[in-house]
From Swiss-Prot:
Subcellular location(s) per record: Cell inner membrane
Transmembrane stretches, start-end: 1-21, 33-52, 60-80, 92-112
Name of the protein described by the UniProt record: UPF0299 membrane protein CGSHiEE_04225
Keywords: Cell inner membrane, Cell membrane, Membrane, Transmembrane, Transmembrane helix
Source organism, top-level taxon: Bacteria
Record HAMAP family: UPF0299 (MF_01144)
Xref: NCBIfam families: PRK01821.1
Recorded family membership: Belongs to the UPF0299 family.
Presence of keyword Translocase: no
Length: 143
């Protein structure tokens, strides 16, 4: 029981340290990225580089995930409380979201199409080169 309590406290302390470091970075680098996101990035880097082991934070993270719905209730209450303000500012909120979504979809679509064409062209070019090498017509081949 005491060991499990120690593991829980250790995991919550590590998560709190990552959050505090993220808030510190957000304070010194005013980029508009919240401290919690910086903290998540630091935690991700720590986990991927194995500076932080997954079992060190597992208990605290699973506890927070289990009660995530309860933790988001204040946000929902805030949205309901200030719904009149949100309705007044709907143009300012919706237009950038719709435009950025459309631009993102277009860019991803064109990029995907371009990369698909490049990949299929490379595959076809390799086929032609292979066929010409088999037939012995390498003098006409220009790469």
């Amino acid at each position: 029981m005491i060991q499990k309590l120690f593991l829980l406290v250790r995991s919550l302390v590590i998560l709190s340290i990552m959050l505090s470091l993220g808030n510190l970075i957000a304070y010194y680098i005013p980029s508009g990225v919240p401290g919690s996101i910086w903290g998540l990035l630091l935690l991700f880097l720590g986990l991927t580089t194995r500076v932080i082991h997954l079992n060190w934070i597992y208990l605290g993270a699973s506890l927070l995930i289990r009660f995530m719905a309860v933790l988001f209730v204040p946000v929902s209450v805030g949205i309901i409380k200030y719904s009149d303000l949100l309705i007044e500012q709907i143009n300012i909120l919706l237009v950038p979201n719709i435009v950025s979504t459309c631009v993102t979809l277009l860019v991803i679509g064109f990029l995907g199409h371009y990369l698909y064409q490049m990949q299929s062209f490379t595959h076809k070019r390799k086929k032609v080169i292979k066929r010409k090498r088999k037939s012995g017509k390498t003098s006409q081949l220009v790469c």
